[in-house]
Amino acid sequence: EPVRELRTLLDFSHTYGYPVMMKRTDGGGGRGITVVHDDDEMRRFYMNHDAMQGGDLDEYFIEKFIDKARHVETQCGRDRFGDFTVYSTRDCSVQRRNQKLVEEAPAPFLPDEVINQLETYSRSLFNKVDYIGLGTCEFMVTPHRKVYFLEVNPRLQVEHTVSEEVCGLDLVREQIDIADGGHLTPAPAPRGHSFELRITSEDPATNLTPSSG
């Protein structure tokens, strides 16, 4: 849930430990993320944003910050009959300014136990809310292979094509068939390896900030 009060932000940080990651609720994707390392920094962050809003307090998402983590996703599907499948894993760890630049499927260098854990968590999430259709579960995986849940995207994302390449299925068609009341197609074993590289418009003269081109 979004958090508004400074006391709640501090309590969370004391419970889970610094550093923590702050993000305003009105920032899409990875935009607006700030890493906070201690109580003094949290108070400065909070007061600066409060002042900029003229006393109209923002709401924030706060999470434990995982240093040097990998951003790993599962492309999942579930039909109205309760059948579930993971079409592929994806690694989206290559980013700039918290925006994805390279997507890779299947996610490399993951041991079977971590893959099984990701699939178990994803299945549980979809079953819990009786999710029907295709979606993406996103996780952070630490260097010690500890898994943290990030979010569910209840849609196909632009990087779904790398999953299509390795599972051999048309995922847009899958989504339509499931919405029409059909059964999902169980995902076959991954074949080969696939990359998607995003072309972005950035200005090298200003530290690669986004540019209109």
Describe the function of each predicted region.
Residues P19, R24, G29, H37-G213:
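ATP-dependent carboxylate activation and anion-phosphoryl transfer catalytic cores
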Residues E1-G32:
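A conserved helix-loop-beta module that forms one wall/lid of the active-site cleft
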